[in-house]
């Protein structure tokens, strides 16, 4: 895998608050190598390590995108939800940003059935099929469609398991991470100072609570994916 330059600037990361970890009482001792200091009761993340692992992650996603691989971005907490959907749409990735339904990957056959149902209902709605039904039946189907749109809208075009999963908050998305580990799907995960750095294939130490921090990391990864996709299209 070729190493590339991704213009990851330490001062820009500081302005985004990427270096602010959790309070010193809420930490995972395994994060010690990624912490540079304690300040006013919080741990400070070593941004040199952040830059190194973010660069590795960018190399990985660029390489995968240049070979036509598929990505899934997972971030369901309120702060991250809009950032995740916008980033995923920009890079033509699948995403989950509302709620992770247990077994979404490990029980893929069930997820596929839900997706087929979702597509059928969307087609029915577009062709005004609901208007031909009794009002009560139409209302039930509309509620079903709304629920499926909320939870599966970001993966509606997914036809198989993703090749790489990007996780925005390890603690929040632990179930998704465990499913990826079970299936052997490579993962990239933001890890704050209360996380376990040994679970994901590439762990990026960063503040996973601040919107600016999440945006900074996502923007770099999305840029790398888009660059990789351009390379894939040109070489196809």
Curated annotation (Swiss-Prot):
Disulfide bonds: none annotated. InterPro entries: Ribosomal_uS2 (IPR001865), Ribosomal_uS2_bac/mit/plastid (IPR005706), Ribosomal_uS2_CS (IPR018130), Ribosomal_uS2_flav_dom_sf (IPR023591). GO terms for biological process: translation. It is found in: Plastid, Chloroplast. Its main location: plastid. GO terms for molecular function: structural constituent of ribosome. Keywords: Chloroplast, Plastid, Ribonucleoprotein, Ribosomal protein. One of its GO terms (cellular component) is chloroplast. Belongs to the universal ribosomal protein uS2 family. NCBIfam families: rpsB_bact. This is Small ribosomal subunit protein uS2c. It comes from Draba nemorosa (Woodland whitlowgrass). The gene is rps2.
